[in-house]
Each structure stands twice: as structure tokens, then as C-alpha cells.
Amino acid sequence: MSTSTNKAGDIIDDLISLKVDRQKTAIKKIISAMTIGRDVSKLFPHVVKCIITPNLELKKLVYLYIINYARVKPLETLLAVNALKRDASDFNGNPLTRALAVRTMGCLGVEEIMQFLCDPLKDALNDKDPYVRKTGALCVAKIYDINPQLAEDQFGFLDKIKEMLEEETNAMVLANCISALIEISTTKGKDILEINWSKCRHLMSALHENNEWTQIYLLEGISRYSPTKQDEINEMIERIIPCVSHSNAGVVLSVIKILIKLLDLVENPETIRSVCKKITPSLVTLLSSEPEIQYVALKNINILIQKRPIIFEKDIKIFFSSFTEPLYNKLEKLEIIYKLVSMNNIDIVLNELKEYASDVDIKFVRRSVKLIGQCAIKLEKAAQRCVETLVELVKTQVSFVIQEAIIALKDIFRRYPNTFEGAMAIINENLRTLDDPEAKAALIWIIGEYSDRIEGAENQLIKFIDNLKEEPYVIQINILDSATKTFLKCQSEESYNILNQVFDFCTKECEDPDVRDRGYMYYRLMTIDPQLASKIIVNDKPRINEDVSGFDDNLLAILMDNLGTMATIYEKPPEAFVKKLKKNISRMIMKVNMKNHNLILMRMIIICQKKKKKKKRRWILLII
């Protein structure tokens, strides 16, 4: 106990010392203890006294301590307000000091202090230094989050930021004004970022003057303008399209989002083709990056292709996988291949998918085999070639390949009834290899559906009845359906005995309510009127439509508006996974906590990459 007291006393002695080095050492020790969860709030009065130092490094450390304990000790924090106001009003001093003071006051999060911040903030928004102005713009959003009336009505900060969008000449300040207005829109539940043609041109003129992070904010502002004239559309395309070749993935995706939106308004088909040709190389470049960046690019390409398939209609080979790629990228490429497959490229696609069947990753192999079946359903003229490919894969005698091929063939038989019955022979030869419930269910369905054409259908069906009680629901329900169909079609003694066994199980032993209820329904229906039962159960079923794996129109529109954000990764609207996002705002960017950050984290995309320094984390989150 005495040791701890002595240490605290030594730190206090250093804090009240007139030597800056001793003060810095003491505050660093305090912050180090603070970061590991120790309560050092008792030192608050002594730390606050150091705020008057002219040393910028020491001042930053003191501000960091005050921000951390402002909510815990709001009354003591008032002691630091005068010093903060003095630093914020030091117009002849260092602009970094003024900006730091304004930012610190905004981060305190104490409503009682917000009133004191308003006058320094008003000065900051009119400061001659752009760094101070950009810091002030973000503080407006912080004030609004705590006291909306104070920011909007009493001091008119919102109107001031809107004016700055047209008058401000510095790109960083413009970017932070846009960021603040978007954040306030999220809090308010109403979009207040109103961009007209004059503001849009002003933003475009500042687009190439700064770094990539600023460009992304400016592009977000530009994307809010909806042009009505072809001249405006053409000018916007001409001025932003150079950014599509940017090295930063966030800038590329932000530009593409705007271009795709503008293409919906373009009347000239030649312009559409020209813009799409310029978009393609940039996306291809992203696919040569690290696997994590590739995944983000693939997710966004998957959305883009549904909107504008012309972008990659002749470049399907780009999405062929190599064995060294991670599974998540290979699976995403398969989704894109399905959307791009056509009669012009079906042969090379089938050859590639056939090669994938020998991959070491079982999940990837099964998905590749499934895709062959989906191609058959999508392209009727290529169905024969797809079935032949599936039959060849069954002959490889690889169990999971056979099982996935049977599942795919079941869907093909439903799509094209009475067309590919020759493939049933190869299925009958591989019954013993089935251990997957879904594959078994698919085979049982095929036996029941074509029992009048399969030789010995009853003998094949009876093999699945011995352990019926231990089988999962999907097999039990399919055996019930197939046994009923087989009896109604064949009318043989064997099929009658099988049906009786299945009915006995369903009505007396089965614990699943769905199987039991259907068993009773079939039993009573066949007892009352077998002919009616035949018309109901053994009837011509509607052909399944093309397997649609895309997004519905509403979701696609939302994802296009949020291209390059986490919404495209989750494939959900932002309000579906961001709790603080207002439900009545659709197609808005995500809101994340901005405390202790210089910039509001406006648009996010996860880009994991290795850091060169060993002490830093291996994975980082780049904010775009």
C-alpha cells in the first residue's frame, strides 16, 4: 500500500515540476496505466494544471487524459475549459494548438461543456488555417450528436457548413464538411446533404487536389447529385473517370459507383460501352491484389455484373481459379461465372468446372459440380453437354462428386422432364456410394418420379426402408412420396408391400409431425379414392425456372448506392446490421463511433494487409 502511495506521490511531484521532461514522463506513466484499465482519475486536478504548457507534445497527452475522464469527472473538467478556450482563441499562435483544443472540446462528450465550445467553434470555422477549419467541421457533428438544438438553431452551425460547401477552397475542409453533414443526417433521420450543380462542380474541381482519403469524401458528395441534363452527365463522367485508374481500391469503387449511376441516365449507347471498357481494367487490377482485397473486389463485381453484365461479358476467364487461391475467393468466383455464362463460353466453362472436380477442397468441388447443373438449367441448348459432363464426373467414382452430381441431375430432370432418362443407368450403378442425406433424398425422388421407367424401382426403393426410423426428415418425407408414387404408377405387389410398410412407420412410429401428417393424408386419400389420389400425387409438375442467384431489384438498388461499403460484403442493407442507423433512412452510409478520431469513419471496406513493422498489428482496417 505504501509503495503505491509513494509512486503516486512521485508522479504528483513530477507533474507539479517546472521541467517539461519530468511532466511528460509522469503523464506518459499515467496514460500507460489508464490504457490497461487502472483508475488514475484521482490525479485529475494535478494533470489539468499541466494544460497551460506551451509544449505541444505535453499538451496532447494532457488532452488525451482529459477526454478519457471527462464523463467521469464533469465538474473537474470545467476547470480545463478556460485553458481550452484560450488555446482555441490563440490566433497568433500555432494552428495545431487551436485545432487540438477545438477537437478536444468536441470529444469531451459532456453536455454542460458544449455551450462553452460554441464560440471557439464559430471562430474555428472562420479560421484562416484550413487545418483548423476542417477540425471545426467535424466538431459540428459532435455537438449535434449531444445537443442538436444548440448546433442547428442557436448558433446556425449547419447552415455555416452548407455555405462552406460552395465557398471553401481547401479540399480537406470540403471533405470534412461532407462527412459532418452525412453524420448529422444519420443522427437526424433526414438527409440534409443537398448538392446542386454548382456545389457538384465545386467538389469536382477539388477532386484531384488531395490524397485518396479526401477524394473518397468528395466523391461521396458528388454521388449525391442527380443530373437532369445530358451536358451535366457528360461533364461529370469526363471529370471523374480519371480517378478510376487510382491505386486506392476505395477511390476506384467510389468512382465506379457514380459512373454506374450516371450510365442509367446516359442516352448514347456508345458512351455506355466506352465507360464500361474503362471500368473493366481497374477492376481487373484489383483482382491481382492481396487475397483479402480480391474478396472485396469480387463481392462488388458480383453486384456490378448483375447491373451491367457488359463490363465482363467477354472476360470470363479472369474469374477462373487457381489451386493456390483461398476458398472464399474461389467460391465467390463461381458465383460470378454463373452470372456470366452464356452459349458463347459454355464449353470453356464446362471444361474448367470439370477440372475443379479434382481440387483438394471438397466444398469447392461440390459447389463446382452444382454449378454445372445450374448452367444446364440456365442454358437449355447446353443442357445436353452439361448432363454429359455430370455423367463423366460420376464415372470418377469419387463419392462426394457422385452425390453432388445426383443432386444436380435431380434439378435437371425437373427442369427437362422425360429428356435425359439415359443418365439414370449411371445413377443406379452408384447407389452404394451415397451417404449424404441430400443426395439420398435426390435419388429417392428420382426413383419415385420415374418408377414406371426404372427397371426394378421397387427393389431400389426397399433398400432405403430398412433403417427408416434412423433417417433424417428429408429422407423420410421423400421415401413417403416416392413409395406412394411407385405404387400408383406400377400397381405391383412389391410396391403395395413397400407402401404398407411406409404407412405403418409414418402413422405409428414416426416422431416428426410433418411426416406423420402427410402419411395420414396419403393413407386416407388412397383409402377414399385411389384415382383422385393419383391425380393429386402423380401429376405433371411445373418446370422449375432458371436458377436465379442474383439480388432482387430493391436490394440491388440499395447495394449499388452503397458500393464499396460493408453492405456489399454482407449483401444486406446497412440498416440491417448497423443498429444506430435510422430505419427510415434507406441507402445511407454506415454510422460508426467517431470518438478520438480526426475523421468521421464514413465509408468502410475491410482491406487486410501485412504491416511492415513487426510491432504493429498484422491486420489493419483501412477506412475509405
Predicted regions and their residues:
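Alpha-helical solenoid scaffolds in large eukaryotic transport, assembly, and signaling factors
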Residues: 1-4, 10-83, 105-109, 185, ...
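Short inter-helical turns and helix N-cap capping residues of alpha-solenoid HEAT/ARM repeat scaffolds
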Residues: 18-19, 54-55, 91-94, 128-130, ...
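HEAT/HEAT-like alpha-solenoid repeats
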Residues: 4-10, 40-51, 75-88, 113-125, ...
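WD40 beta-propeller repeat blades
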Residues: 161-200, 205-210, 288-293, 341-344, ...
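Solenoidal tandem-repeat scaffolds enriched in leucines and small polar residues
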Residues: 124-273
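Hydrophobic residues within the alpha-helices of tandem HEAT/HEAT-like
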Residues: 30-34, 65-71, 104-110, 139-146, ...
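Acidic, serine/threonine-rich low-complexity intrinsically disordered linkers/hinges in large eukaryotic
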Residues: 1-8, 14-23, 36, 53, ...
